[in-house]
Amino acid sequence: MMALVRDRRAHYVMSIVIRWVHCFSSSLRGTFGTRWEAMKAKATELRVCCARRKREAREFKPPQMRGSTRLNISDDLKIGFFSTDHATQTDSSEILSVKELSSSTQKLAQMMKSLQVDFGFLKQLLQLKFEDRLKEESLSLFTILHDRILEIEKHYQQNEDKMRKSFNQQLADAIAVIKGMYQQFFEVEEENVSLQDASTVKTNILLRKLKEKEEVIKELKEELDQYKDFGFHKMESFAKETSSPKSNLEKENLEYKVENERLLQIISELEEEIQINLKENSGLEDELISMKEMAEKDHKTIQKLMDSRDRLREELHYEKSLVQDVINKQKEDKEMRKKYGSLSVKVARSAKGREASLSPWPKSPPSTTALRPHSATMSVSSAGAQKAKMPKKALKEDQAVVEDKHGLESQIEALKANLENEKKKVERFRKEADRLNKSWEKRFFILRNSFHVLKNEMFTRHTLFRQFAVLADTSFNYIKVKPLLVQSRTTMTAISSSSHCTSSIDGKHVDVVSDQAALQLSPKGKLSESPKEESLEEPSMRQSSPAETVD
């Protein structure tokens, strides 16, 4: 009975082990392939052995014991009073199976230990991989945050630079306004300083500073050398003199050390100032490069404006020539009309002469006209047929005069219609020329104002850059300014100022008048010009409104 229980337990344990091995075979097949195969083979062998032992035990049992489930060792030993006491002994045939079961359990325990070790290694490997992945993710997050912080700092610095520049610009504007208000009532005589760029002034100032600092450094180095030489000589003299006390030597040595430290500190400060000046020089060089680029851009814009002005002048000359051609055509049309008028007058006079020449006398000569060929033939026929009867001749002449009159009236009506058409054409050409003149006057006015605005902007920009360069590093050691001489403008001679003002005003007036005259006399001819250009000119006129206030 005990053997059967043990066999069942062994079978149950083996089934659990095999099931567990089947569950983890998919995950551990790559790393523990050979060990898994060995363990599986051993498990199958144990299973086969257990089945064979059971079968042999059943076959070799005596017939009297085949029906009972209890073993026969404890049947003869009458120890207890109950039936449960009979199954406490082990049969001799069961000893071998117990040994095999114990050996198999030991092997299974060893395998479990090895599996525990392997699982420990796997756990450590997964933990290390997780830590590496965590470090990578944290590093990526740190880099992203660091880049974002750098971008924010850069944006903040840019905003700070913009604010600083705007404040400097406002300060320069306020100073310029105060200077202009001050110069309205007083005349200030200052030292004539050569007009240089702001960058050159700054570089000269910094070079002067560098030279001064270098001279100071040289002087301090010379003093240091002198102190060192003097100290060494003194030490030698003190060593020779045995009567000199040691306390004085120590005091002087301390004083020299303090002086040396002070000089070294001054030298370090001067070196720091030199580095700062070098940085300022580099910044000024960058500003100089940017100013040069801005000047090149301004020069390019001015060149473009000059090219556009030349192109507009060429178009203006072309329009002038076209309008002159139109005027010449109009003059030719007028001459043709005059010729037609004189012709009509001559025809009327000839008609009147014919009517006067017609009379009731038979021997009156026939009237001839130069315009109608059939009248000449009639006169020739009438001259050839003088012997005809008088009533027939009179009737024929009356018919010819009536026909001539009708032809002349039709010609006069056609000429009048042509005259009306020509008048309408001339009026239309005149209106078109006026419209084109006005549009071109507007264009030239806008172009001139924009050109003046660009010139004023360049001038103000350069003046403000100079003011900024002077105000950026204000110091009393840079430029020695003379005392200002303030004079009231009322004490100045009125002749020079009046002459200067009148000459400048006359010059401006003459320029404006000449421009207006040129614009009025310059007729424009592009009759087929589209109205899109006028619509494009309107925003430019709106933009040029502040330029008019500036002028």
Curated annotation (Swiss-Prot):
State the GO CC annotations: mitochondrion
Annotated localization:
Mitochondrion
Q: Which residues form a coiled coil?
A: 203-315, 405-439
Write down the superkingdom of origin.
Eukaryota
Asked if ATP-binding is a keyword of the record, the answer is no
Any idea which UniProt keywords this protein has?
A: Coiled coil, Mitochondrion, Transit peptide
Give the transit peptide range: 1-36
Region span, Disordered: 354-389, 519-551
InterPro entries linked to this entry: C10orf67-like, DUF4709, DUF4724
Primary localization: mitochondrion
Please name the PANTHER family in this protein's record.
RIKEN CDNA 4921504E06 GENE
What assembly does the database describe for this protein? Interacts with NOD2.
Q: What is this protein called?
A: Uncharacterized protein C10orf67, mitochondrial
Give the originating organism.
Homo sapiens
